[in-house]
UniProtKB/Swiss-Prot annotation:
Gene name of the record: rplX
Gene3D superfamilies in UniProt: 2.30.30.30
CDD domains associated with the record: KOW_RPL26
Stated name of the protein: Large ribosomal subunit protein uL24
Keywords: Ribonucleoprotein, Ribosomal protein, RNA-binding, rRNA-binding
Family matches, as InterPro entries: KOW, Rib_uL2_dom2, Ribosomal_uL24, Ribosomal_uL24_CS, Ribosomal_uL24_KOW, Translation_prot_SH3-like_sf
Length: 105
């Protein structure tokens, strides 16, 4: 099954405390994604000299549910739904539903 979102896609948050923020997908874990500069939380870390970790409070991105994001359409500057188009040779392409443009091309 082809994924509607992929690592490296530009997305916009459509729900939650970070609604309206934009970022790039860093990691996908099942139905949750980590987006750069979105859902920043503070983590308390212990110092670990063997790994070179100084410890203290560290700001990092926490995962958010995939239903709270939409892929960003660069032509419109808004969030858009993702559709699929199957070519004659059997290749499956992701397209923007509003414009029909191929994603990532």
């Amino acid at each position: 099954m082809a994924s509607r979102i992929k690592k490296g896609d530009q997305v916009i948050v459509i729900a939650g405390k970070d609604k309206g923020k934009q970022g790039e997908i860093i990691r996908i874990d099942g139905h949750r994604v980590v987006v750069s500069n979105v859902n920043i939380v503070k983590r308390h870390t212990k110092p670990n000299p063997q790994r070179g970790i100084s410890g203290g409070l560290i700001d990092r991105e926490a995962p958010i549910h995939v239903s709270n994001i939409q892929i960003l359409n660069p032509m419109t500057g808004k969030g858009d739904r993702v559709g699929f188009k199957i070519l004659d040779d059997g290749c499956k392409l992701r397209i923007f539903r509003s414009t029909g443009e191929v994603i990532g091309a």
